[in-house]
Each structure stands twice: as C-alpha cells, then as structure tokens.
Amino acid sequence: MRISRKAAATTAIAGLLLALTACSSSDSGATALDPNADLSKQTLTVSNWAAYNPDDLPAKFEEKFGTKVTITNHATNEEIMAKLTAGGDSGIDVAFVSGQFAQALSAQGLIEDLDKTLISNEANLYPEAAKLAYDPGNKYSMPYSWGTTGICYRADLMKGNEPTSWNDLLMPKPQYKGKVTMLATERWLMLPAQKALGFSANTQDEAEMGKVKDLLVKAKSNLLAYDDTTFYERLVTGEAVMVEAWDGWCNYGIAKNKNIKFVVPKEGSDLFTDVMVVLKTSKNKEAAHAFINYILDKDVQSWVVDNILYKVPNIPAMEKSLPALVGDFPNMGITPAELLKNESLVDLGKASALYTRIATEVTAK
C-alpha cells in the first residue's frame, strides 16, 4: 500500500551514509544529451515506492514516447540506496528518493546533473521548490512531492487543550499521558525535541544532541508507543489523542474521522521532499529526462494530490486539485511560502552515526 513509503524507513541510513562518505567521489558533471534522440529505441527502469504513481503511467508514457517503462518498487530509501551504491550498474535509470538521499548520491557522483533544456515542465514548479537546502536550484533532482511534520490530534478529545507546541507532545498534560505516539524513524524521532529546544533539525553538534537525547528519554514515559505505521488508526479509535505525524499521513486519519486535526507547532518543523534523479550508469538518459518532464505534467502531479493526499510543488496541479480537497484536508492548503519557513532536511554525512546511536539508546526497552 502507498503509505508504506515512510513507515518502513529504518535507522540503517547512518551506516550507509557513513560508508558513502568514505567512498571516493567521481566527476558529477552532466553528460551531453541528444535532444533529438529516438526515444522509441530506449527503455527505462524506474524505482519508486509502491503505489506512489498511477498504475497506467508506464503504458501512457510508452504510448506517447514509444519508450517501454518498467517500474520496480523499493520499500525504503535505505533499500534503494543500498542497491544504487553497491557498485556497478544497478540497471535503474530513474530513482525516486527523499531529498537528503539525493544529496548523498550526488556527493558520490552517482547521479547526473540534469539537463534542464529537456525538462521544460520545470516551469510548473513553485519558485520555492528551487530553494531547498539539499539541492538549491534543483541541479541534480526534481521534486515530486513535499510536506511537513506536525501534531495530528483528536480535537473532540482535547477541547481546550489543543496542542500548539512540541512540548505539548513531549510533556503532555496528565490526562493525556499514555495516549501519545511519536515517530520511530530517527530523523523524525529527534525532530520534536530538536525544535522544542530551539535547535536545527540538521544539527551535528554533539552537545545539542546530548540535550535532545535527555529530553527524549524524559518524554518516553509519557508515550503509548513509537509508531510509524498505525498512529492515525490509533487516533481514529481514540486509543491515542495526539501523535507526531507527517501531514499527508494525518490526512489518512482525517478521511476516517473529521475530529482529527493537524497543526505545525509554533517552534517550527521540517520540510521533507521526495525527488527524482537520473543515475550516472543509465544508458537511456534522454528517455530518463523525458520521463521526469512527463511526471511534472499537471495531470500526473494532480494524481499524487488526489490519491496520495500529499502536496506537490507543482502550480497547475495544485490549482487543479486543491479546491476540492482543502475543505476536508486543511493542511493541503499550507502554502509553499509557509512550508519554506520550516527546515529542509539535508544529508548528515558522518553525523548520521550520532543520530543512530541516540535513536537506539532512546528507543531501547
């Protein structure tokens, strides 16, 4: 199911990115491409999260361009990163990854700088989409969807005590203790404490992260669970009254219970992005660029909004889909400017090991 995209993420990124940093980097310049290439003579293998694109996407792309497309699935960023960094040709032409992972791939010379002359639909993107810290100007990646993390809660069960701060989640009022969940994936496990303490979501400072750990350990006794997969269901049933949640996932709960609401805490949050990249080893780079350009079409991107309930940084797609959704799912109306007030997640490099160690120590039984 499509929502397994984030749920399956694990703390394996730490060791992986540490290994990546130790590898030697190759030239990351773009390969010269032929704008008149016969795309019917090229084939594409694309790796994406399951159910994260329309089922008929390969057939429609082949009908338009003559290029046969095979879409394979990965469950996590870590899974596809392991495949792409194993050495040799992975056989993948285009991969969908989160922004900070694209940054790591680019640093190791494993993905192409994009030829923007072949991606005219970049013009559909909001200007804010070119201002993200992991890839300013979208030099080597093109955004597919974006969002933020906040508190998803049952307004009917918290009347008069609606959360406004990360501290409301970490140190809830006595009547809500044991009815709160936090995300287990390490970057998002750290986020509430980082923001509550006034730190960056990308901090690599050991002293700051020590304070983050102390706050998370203190908060642990207030939790029902660390939960990446069923937190919105817990809200629906009333088992939980307040959970840390990705905005799109909160929408899955809202779809089942209109008493569920979403708020970005006053201390701020993150801005996460899923992107498309072209592998250096691809022998079908013109078709790969055509595929990315096709994905940025209004109708393809509006499918993401309508079916995944995530925002996309695509102006005509949001203009097409938002009016019918924003009434039921108010967080879909968070503007690009509002999103950009939050921190874009970046690759932590060697500091990933620090995050992994703290996550392990905090969540250990």
Enumerate the predicted regions with their spans:
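Conserved C-terminal helix/tail region of periplasmic/extracytoplasmic solute-binding proteins
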Residues: T335-K365
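C-terminal motif of bacterial Sec signal peptides marking the signal peptidase cleavage site
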Residues: A19-A22
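Bacterial N-terminal signal peptides that target proteins for export
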Residues: M1-T11
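Mature extracytoplasmic/periplasmic domains
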Residues: L279-L339
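Periplasmic-binding protein-like
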Residues: M209-K218, I254-S282
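Extracytoplasmic ligand-binding site segments that recognize negatively charged/polar headgroups
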Residues: S47-P54, G91-I92, F96-E239
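Early extracytoplasmic/lumenal segment of secretory-pathway proteins
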Residues: S24, T31-A104
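A ligand-binding cleft/hinge motif common to bilobed small-molecule-binding domains
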Residues: F101-A104, M242-N259
